[in-house]
């Protein structure tokens, strides 16, 4: 789709690391839609999914615990997500000044003491000269909700999820950021008892993010006898998408400037690509549970990592063999069988050449834990055909 931009707009687009043809391609997708994934079949146990026995889980946990002491292990946490969606319904109530009798307001009132932010909210609200006891049980509850969400109070609607009080314990509350400190200490501890955590954050919240992390770091290092190495990055603006009007024309803000919106989490692959580690655990900032429930998480994370290390060892050995010697037909079949059965690689021929095998093996290995499909929304594992005709197992 051809779009006319002014010279200043072209300079603005290029300064962000993008180009006019790339922006035009985005608008073509808006107009014509995106092609559907060519799903061949759902992945099932034995066909894309490996189901570990209890003995295998114990074995791979042991593999990981023995080898992790000599490895650089990184926890990669996409953390730029704002909390606005969590409070969308409440924000609508504040914006429209009601209705106070709505179900969401009643639920908020009934459950207010169960929220991790309750004490902070009440303290801040009363410090502002308000009466909590009278307002929580009257129409003035809307003022409490506004104090929770807006800049004059806790500003939760505009903060990233990482900075919210997330979980309540008997003697403390924790943010989602702190829960990632705990998780890292439990399963992402590498050599020299070092836990590397990398957070992707939005530029406007970077300073607040760093301030919270640094203020809590020493406390959790002492509590779990680890050393945290923290790093941060922001999403590359070149991956942003130009907003469009309903007429599929470039959207301009109230100052007349083009408005770009951040891409989805898939855009963070570039951030990940710039990091170096032997093993990388990937987990969203809000995908954490309380520490008293964490044992299953630790078990399966370690088992997955141990299985990854076993696959790596086999794959690396086969790659070295491919590089250094001329393989026999039987050796090629052995390696191809490993790639098909263990790495879910589909070859175009039942008798792949040595070079084809090496090309398929020479790539990162990703292990994804699967949960039983019980009708919940979200992606799932499928065998997918790409435009070039190749078939691979993907999360769709």
What are these regions (language model features)?
Residues 394-396:
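Beta-strand/loop nucleic-acid-binding surfaces
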Residues 381:
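Acidic, two-metal ion nucleic-acid-processing modules in DNA metabolism proteins
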Residues 10-13, 39-86, 91-374, 384, ...:
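Domain-scale recognition of functional cores that engage charged ligands
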Residues 1-45:
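N-terminal regions that are enriched for targeting/export leaders
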């Amino acid at each position: 789709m051809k779009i006319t931009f002014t010279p200043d707009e072209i300079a603005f687009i290029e300064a962000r690391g993008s180009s006019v043809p790339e922006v035009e391609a985005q608008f073509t997708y808006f107009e014509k839609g995106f092609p559907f994934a060519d799903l061949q079949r759902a992945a099932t146990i034995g066909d894309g999914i490996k189901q570990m026995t209890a003995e295998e889980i114990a074995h791979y946990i042991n593999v990981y615990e023995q080898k992790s002491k000599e490895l650089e292990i990184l926890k990669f946490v996409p953390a730029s997500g704002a909390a606005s969606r969590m409070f969308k319904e409440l924000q609508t109530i504040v914006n429209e000044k009601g209705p106070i009798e709505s179900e969401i307001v009643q639920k908020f009132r009934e459950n207010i003491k169960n929220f991790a932010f309750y004490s902070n909210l009440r303290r801040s609200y009363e410090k502002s000269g308000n009466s909590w006891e009278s307002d929580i049980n009257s129409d003035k509850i809307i003022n409490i909700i506004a104090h929770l969400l807006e800049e004059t109070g806790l500003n939760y609607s505009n903060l990233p999820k990482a900075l919210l009080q997330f979980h309540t314990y008997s003697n403390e509350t924790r943010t989602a950021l702190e829960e990632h400190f705990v998780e890292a200490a439990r399963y992402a501890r590498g050599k020299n008892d070092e836990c590397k955590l990398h957070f992707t954050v939005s530029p406007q919240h970077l300073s607040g993010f760093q301030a919270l992390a640094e203020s809590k770091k020493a406390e959790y290092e002492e509590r779990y006898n680890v050393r945290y190495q923290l790093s941060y990055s922001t999403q590359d603006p070149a991956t942003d998408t130009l907003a469009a009007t309903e007429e599929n024309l470039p959207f301009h803000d109230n100052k007349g400037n083009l408005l770009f919106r951040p891409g989805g989490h898939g855009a963070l692959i570039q951030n990940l690509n710039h990091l170096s580690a032997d093993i990388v655990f990937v987990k969203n900032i809000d995908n954490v549970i309380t520490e008293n429930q964490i044992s299953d998480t630790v078990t399966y994370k370690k088992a997955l990592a141990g299985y990854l290390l076993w696959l790596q060892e086999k794959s690396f050995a086969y790659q070295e063999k491919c590089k250094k010697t001329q393989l026999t037909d039987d050796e090629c079949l052995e390696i191809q069988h490993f790639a098909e059965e263990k790495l879910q690689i589909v070859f175009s021929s039942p008798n792949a050449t040595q070079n084809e095998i090496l090309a398929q093996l020479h790539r990162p290995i990703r292990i994804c834990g699967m949960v039983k499909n019980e009708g919940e929304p979200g992606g799932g594992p499928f065998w997918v055909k790409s435009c070039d005709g190749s078939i691979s197992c993907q999360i769709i």
